[in-house]
Amino acid sequence: MRLPTLARSRAKSFTMLAATSLMLAACAGEATAPVASTLRTQERTSPFVPTDAQRALVGVTDGTYSFTINPGQTQTLQLGASGLYIPAGAICDVAGSSYGMGTWNDACSPQTEPMTITAVVRNAATDHPSVEFQPALRFSPSKQVWLYMAVTNQATLDATKVLWYCNDTECLDESTTDGDLKSYVDTKNFMVFRRIKHFSGYVVAEFSTRPLSLDVGLDLGF
């Protein structure tokens, strides 16, 4: 299948990040007290839970999902076992709204025309699933858009997991600068989820006090 240009450029980086994030848990235990990391993510029941049939397909659900939506209507988009909730009127006008760091909380006019959303899912059958959305857009700060990522490796899902935002060079825990964006884990239903304010890339990985580099040639500091 053909991936969007930005998705193709990051495909290898997301795969590498999933592997290196395993180092994070071990090294975090050496550098910090275990209690601090386990308190990082709050446990909460996910309002979105995939069916057993949807979970059974995990492993074949990596790939590209495309949806043509009416932004004036509330949407719940199924991404294999994961999901995205977009309330009516949440999408900022794609052509006229600002986009980028520092703009996520700016007011905006809503998108009114139907549009196509593309989501590229990778590593769905692991405990480090990722998704990348196109086009680049942001959501009205007065609306709450939620991303729910299913984690299939049940043995490793705990309160150290964070849903990171990834740009072209690194992944960031956005909750350090915006309390609205803190992650939650549902260890019973094996979900990691949080509110998001823009379309970019997102990946589930262990908590770290530093950004995660997408360039495996850099010192990740784990």
Can you say where each PLM-predicted feature lies in the sequence?
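Short, solvent-exposed mixed-charge patches
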Residues: 220-222
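Predominantly extracellular/luminal regions of secreted and cell-surface proteins
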Residues: 71-115
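C-terminal motif of bacterial Sec signal peptides marking the signal peptidase cleavage site
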Residues: 24-26
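Proteolytic processing hotspots in large secreted/extracellular or virion-associated proteins
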Residues: 37-75, 106-172, 209
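C-terminal beta-strand-rich structural cap/linker in extracellular carbohydrate-active enzymes
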Residues: 191-214
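Surface-exposed loop/edge segments in extracytoplasmic proteins
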Residues: 169-182
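Bacterial N-terminal signal peptides that target proteins for export
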Residues: 2-16
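Bacterial signal peptide processing site
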Residues: 28-31
